[in-house]
C-alpha cells in the first residue's frame, strides 16, 4: 500500500509541475497595460506648430542587418556608404533591447514602446494573432487616420501585427530559413511598380534573406557579401527614383535592421552583435542641412558606429518628420540630429515639447499617483531629462503579477515535496547515486541565482559528468573516455563562445579526419540496425540502403552549402558532380561536423554497457549526459543559440507543429539519444526499478523548475532579468515539459523492441 501511495505521489507531482508552470508563466509574462486610442496634437503654448518635412516614407527593414554589415570596410553596401559620404544619409547604430527577435523589434519600431518578453514565443507561432497591433497607437495607425494608404511587401509578421491595415501587401514566410533568394525576390519584384505609384503614404519592405544566411552559415558565409550587394542595389534603385521622380521628391527613406546577429548567425539574446543593428535616414534634403560623415569607418566599441540611439526613438522621429502625433505609448526620444530640418527655433521647441508632453502622459499612465510636474525641471524638454524618463519607463514596461509568481512557486514546491520522500527512500539501496543527485540539485539550485553561472551552465555539467565518471571508474575499475572531447566539440555560453573548438576550427583544417569519422558513424549505425533487425534479408537490405542514402544525402548537402569541408579531403574529386545533384532545398540544412559526436556517444554507451550499472545508476548517467550533450551540440541558455537550420528537413512548406517538433528534436538531439540509450543499457527493469527511475527524473525536474522560478521571482528587478533569467526560464520549460514529460518519462515505460530501432535510427533521423 505504501508503494502504491508513493507511485500516486509521483503522478501527482508531475501534474503539479504542469500546473505550476501555467500559473507562474501567467504572472511572469503578462501583457502590459497600454493607453487606449490614438494620440492627437496637443497645445504647446508656443503659438506655432512645426510643419512636416516629408510627405511620405519608405521603410526598408533588412532582417538581422548588423551595423558592421553596412558601415565597416568589409561591407557590401558600397552605394549606401557613398550616400553617407555625400551627406544624403544620416547613419546611426540602433540599440535593440532584448529579446532580439523580429516581432518585439517591429513593435518597438512602430509603437515606440518596449514589447513583452512573451513575444519571443509568439514570434515562433506563424499563425498567432494574439499579438496584433491593430488596436494600438502606431505611426502606421496615425498615417491611416489621416487618410494615407499603406503598402507592405516581405515578412508576413507585419501582416500578423497589422491585420487589415495595408491597402496592398504580399507576405513571405519568415521562418523558412532555407530560402536565401526567392524570399527576397518576392519583395524586389514589387519595388519598381510601387515606386511609380502615387497613392501610398508609407511603403514598407522587409527582406529576410540576409537573416536566413546568418541562421544557416553565420555572418562570414560565402553568401553574405552577395546578399549585401543585392540589398545595396535596391537602396540604389530607390534613391535614384527619389531623385528622378517628382512625386518622390519629399520622401523619407529609412533603412534599418530589426536586430543584428551573433558570431554564430543567430539572435534573440543580448550580445553586442545581436543588439546593434544599422539605422539610416536617407533623403537628398539632408545634403544641404548636415555635415557629411566618413564611410567606411572603424567601430569605436563593440559594433558601435557613429552615434547610438534607442530603437524606440524611430517612432517619435518619424512622427515629427512626417507631421504626425507621437503614438500614445511611445517611450522614444526625438533624435536631435533632425532638429536642423526646421530653420525656425520655435518649430524645434515645438517638436521637443510635444515629445516631452507625450512622455509625461505615458508616465502618468504608468505612475498615476506621481506628481510629475513637481519633479520636472523647467527645461523638461531637455534630451537628458527625456532619456532619464525613457530609462525609468523601459524598466517598468512589464508589470509582474506577484500573487501568481508566489502561487506558482508554491505549487512547484509541493511537487518537490511529493517527489522528495520517494527519492529519499531510494537512498537506502542506492545511497551513493541518490546522494550524488542531491548534491547536484543543491549546487544547481544555488547556481541559478547568479547570472554568470546561468550563462556558463555548461561548465557545471562538464564537471559534474567528470565527477560521476570518476565514481563509476572507481566502482568498476573501468575507464570512461570521451567527456573531455565532447566538452570541446562546440564552445558555447557567453565567455568562451568564440574560443577554438573541434567543430569550427579543427575539422575544417583536418577534413579527412572529419569524413573518416562521419563514414565510421554511418557504418556503426548500419551495423546496429542490422544486428537489431529481423533475420530477414529484406530488413537488412533496407537498413543498409537507408544508411547509404542518408550518407550521400549528407554529402550532397555539404557540397552545396559548406564546400569548404570538402576542398582538401579525399572526396574532393567528386565535389563538382555532387554540387550539380538536385535536392530539395530545405534538406540542405544540417551540420556535418556534429555527426561524429554520435559515434563518441556510441563508444561511451558500449563502455557503460560493461559496467553492469543498476537501474538508478543508468538513470543518473543518462540524466547527466543529457544535460552535458545539450551544450556539447552548441546549445546554451541564450535564445540566440536555438538552431533553426534543422527545422525544415523534409518539409516543403511552413507548419508550426512540424517545425516546432523538428526544432526541438534537432536542438535536443543529444538528450534524446541518451534517453533512448538508457533504455538499452538496462533493458529489462522490474516495476520497482522503473518506479525508481521515474522518481529520480521527477524529483530532478521539479527541483530544477522550482530553483529557476525562485531565481526569477527574487531577481525580477535584476538588470539581467530579460537577458539571462527569462531565457533560462524558457529553456527550463522546454526541459521540463518536452524533454521530461515526452522523452524521459516515456523512456521508463515498458516498451518493446521498437526502442532498439529508435536508438539506432536516431543518428540518421536527427541529422
From Swiss-Prot:
Q: Where are the coiled-coil regions?
A: none
**What are the annotated disulfide bridges?**
none
Q: Does the keyword Phosphoprotein apply?
A: no
Alphabetic keyword roster:
Endoplasmic reticulum, Glycoprotein, GPI-anchor biosynthesis, Membrane, Transferase, Transmembrane, Transmembrane helix
Annotated transmembrane regions: 407-427, 434-454, 513-533, 538-558, 595-615, 655-675, 695-715, 733-755
Localized where? Answer: Endoplasmic reticulum membrane
Q: What is its EC number?
A: 2.-.-.-
The record's GO CC annotations read: endoplasmic reticulum membrane; plasma membrane
Which pathway does the record list? Answer: Glycolipid biosynthesis; glycosylphosphatidylinositol-anchor biosynthesis
Q: Which GO terms describe its molecular function?
A: CP2 mannose-ethanolamine phosphotransferase activity
**Membrane topology recorded in Swiss-Prot or TrEMBL:** Multi-pass membrane protein
InterPro entries named in the record: Alkaline_phosphatase_core_sf, Phosphodiest/P_Trfase, PIG-G_N, PIGG/GPI7, PIGG/GPI7_C
> Could you give a single Gene Ontology term from the biological process aspect?
GPI anchor biosynthetic process
| Keyword Transferase in record | yes
- Pfam families associated with the record: Phosphodiest (PF01663), PIGO_PIGG (PF19316)
Q: Which residues are glycosylated?
A: 186, 401, 490, 627
Q: What is its main location?
A: endoplasmic reticulum
User: What CDD domains would the database entry show?
Assistant: GPI_EPT_2
Tell me its family. Belongs to the PIGG/PIGN/PIGO family. PIGG subfamily.
Per the entry, what this protein does is: Ethanolamine phosphate transferase involved in glycosylphosphatidylinositol-anchor biosynthesis. Transfers ethanolamine phosphate to the GPI second mannose.
Q: What is this protein called?
A: GPI ethanolamine phosphate transferase 2
Its organism's taxonomic lineage begins at: Eukaryota, Fungi, Dikarya, Ascomycota, Pezizomycotina
Amino acid at each position: 500500500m505504501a508503494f502504491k501511495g508513493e507511485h500516486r505521489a509521483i503522478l501527482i507531482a508531475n501534474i503539479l509541475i504542469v500546473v505550476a508552470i501555467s500559473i507562474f508563466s501567467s504572472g511572469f509574462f503578462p501583457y502590459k497595460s497600454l493607453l487606449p486610442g490614438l494620440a492627437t496634437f496637443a497645445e504647446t503654448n508656443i503659438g506655432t506648430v512645426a510643419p512636416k518635412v516629408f510627405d511620405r516614407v519608405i521603410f526598408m527593414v533588412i532582417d538581422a542587418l548588423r551595423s558592421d554589415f553596412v558601415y565597416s570596410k568589409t561591407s557590401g553596401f558600397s552605394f549606401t556608404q557613398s550616400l553617407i559620404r555625400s551627406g544624403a544619409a544620416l547613419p546611426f547604430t540602433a540599440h535593440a533591447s532584448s529579446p532580439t527577435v523580429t516581432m518585439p523589434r517591429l513593435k518597438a519600431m512602430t509603437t515606440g514602446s518596449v514589447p513583452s518578453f512573451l513575444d519571443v514565443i509568439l514570434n515562433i507561432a506563424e499563425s498567432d494573432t494574439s499579438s496584433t497591433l491593430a488596436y494600438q497607437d502606431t505611426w502606421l495607425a496615425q498615417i491611416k487616420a489621416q487618410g494615407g494608404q499603406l503598402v507592405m511587401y516581405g515578412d508576413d509578421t507585419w501582416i500578423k501585427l497589422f491585420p487589415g491595415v495595408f491597402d496592398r501587401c504580399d507576405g513571405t514566410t519568415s521562418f523558412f530559413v532555407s530560402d536565401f533568394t526567392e524570399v527576397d525576390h518576392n519583395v524586389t519584384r514589387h519595388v519598381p511598380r510601387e515606386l511609380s505609384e502615387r497613392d501610398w503614404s508609407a511603403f514598407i519592405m522587409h527582406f529576410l534573406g540576409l537573416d536566413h544566411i546568418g541562421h544557416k552559415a553565420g555572418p562570414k558565409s560565402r553568401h553574405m557579401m552577395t546578399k549585401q550587394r543585392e540589398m545595396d542595389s535596391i537602396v540604389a534603385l530607390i534613391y535614384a527614383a527619389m531623385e528622378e521622380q517628382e512625386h518622390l521628391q519629399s520622401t523619407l527613406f529609412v533603412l534599418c535592421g530589426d536586430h543584428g546577429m551573433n558570431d554564430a548567425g543567430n539572435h534573440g539574446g543580448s550580445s553586442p552583435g545581436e543588439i546593434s543593428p544599422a539605422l539610416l535616414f536617407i533623403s537628398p534634403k539632408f545634403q544641404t542641412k548636415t555635415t557629411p560623415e566618413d564611410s567606411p569607418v572603424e567601430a569605436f566599441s563593440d559594433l558601435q558606429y557613429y552615434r547610438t540611439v534607442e530603437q524606440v526613438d524611430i517612432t517619435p522621429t518619424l512622427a515629427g518628420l512626417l507631421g504626425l502625433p507621437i503614438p500614445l505609448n511611445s517611450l522614444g526620444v526625438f533624435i536631435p540630429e533632425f532638429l536642423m530640418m526646421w530653420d525656425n527655433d520655435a518649430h524645434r521647441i515645438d517638436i521637443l515639447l510635444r515629445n516631452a508632453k507625450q512622455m509625461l502622459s505615458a508616465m502618468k499612465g504608468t505612475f498615476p499617483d506621481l506628481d510629475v510636474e513637481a519633479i520636472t525641471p523647467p527645461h523638461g524638454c531637455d534630451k537628458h531629462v527625456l532619456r532619464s524618463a525613457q530609462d525609468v519607463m523601459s524598466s517598468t514596461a512589464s508589470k509582474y503579477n506577484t500573487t501568481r509568481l508566489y502561487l506558482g512557486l508554491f505549487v512547484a514546491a509541493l511537487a518537490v515535496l511529493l517527489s522528495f520522500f520517494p527519492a529519499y527512500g531510494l537512498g537506502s539501496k542506492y545511497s551513493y547515486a541518490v546522494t550524488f543527485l542531491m548534491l547536484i540539485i543543491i549546487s544547481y539550485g544555488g547556481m541559478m541565482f547568479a547570472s554568470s553561472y546561468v550563462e556558463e551552465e555548461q561548465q557545471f555539467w562538464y564537471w559534474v559528468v567528470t565527477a560521476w565518471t570518476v565514481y563509476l571508474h572507481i566502482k568498476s575499475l573501468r575507464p570512461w573516455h570521451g567527456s573531455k572531447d565532447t566538452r570541446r566539440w562546440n564552445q558555447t555560453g557567453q565567455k568562451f563562445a568564440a574560443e577554438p573548438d573541434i567543430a569550427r576550427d579543427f575539422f575544417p583544417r583536418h577534413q579527412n579526419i572529419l569524413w573518416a569519422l562521419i563514414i565510421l558513424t554511418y557504418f556503426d549505425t548500419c551495423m546496429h540496425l542490422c544486428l537489431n533487425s529481423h533475420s530477414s534479408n529484406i530488413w537488412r537490405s533496407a537498413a543498409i540502403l537507408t544508411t547509404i542514402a542518408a550518407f550521400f544525402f549528407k554529402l550532397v548537402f555539404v557540397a552545396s552549402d559548406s564546400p569548404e569541408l570538402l576542398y582538401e579531403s579525399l572526396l574532393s574529386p567528386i565535389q563538382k558532380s555532387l554540387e550539380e545533384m538536385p535536392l530539395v532545398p530545405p534538406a540542405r540544412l544540417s551540420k556535418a561536423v556534429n555527426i561524429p559526436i554520435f559515434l563518441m556517444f556510441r563508444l561511451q554507451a558500449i563502455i557503460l554497457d560493461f559496467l553492469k550499472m543498476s537501474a538508478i545508476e543508468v538513470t543518473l548517467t543518462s540524466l547527466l549526459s543529457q544535460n552535458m550533450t545539450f551544450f556539447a551540440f552548441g546549445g546554451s541558455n541564450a535564445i540566440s543559440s536555438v538552431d533553426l537550420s534543422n527545422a525544415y528537413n523534409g518539409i516543403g512548406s511552413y507548419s508550426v507543429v512540424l517545425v516546432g517538433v523538428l526544432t526541438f528534436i534537432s536542438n535536443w538531439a543529444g538528450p534524446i539519444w541518451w534517453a533512448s540509450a538508457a533504455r538499452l543499457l538496462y533493458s529489462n527493469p522490474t516495476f520497482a526499478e522503473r518506479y525508481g527511475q521515474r522518481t529520480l527524473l521527477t524529483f530532478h525536474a521539479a527541483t530544477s523548475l522550482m530553483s529557476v522560478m525562485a531565481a526569477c521571482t527574487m531577481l525580477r528587478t535584476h538588470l539581467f532579468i530579460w537577458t539571462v533569467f527569462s531565457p533560462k526560464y524558457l529553456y527550463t520549460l522546454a526541459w521540463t515539459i518536452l524533454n521530461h514529460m515526452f522523452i524521459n518519462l516515456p523512456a521508463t515505460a515498458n516498451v518493446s523492441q521498437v526502442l532498439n530501432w529508435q536508438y539506432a535510427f536516431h543518428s540518421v533521423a536527427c541529422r
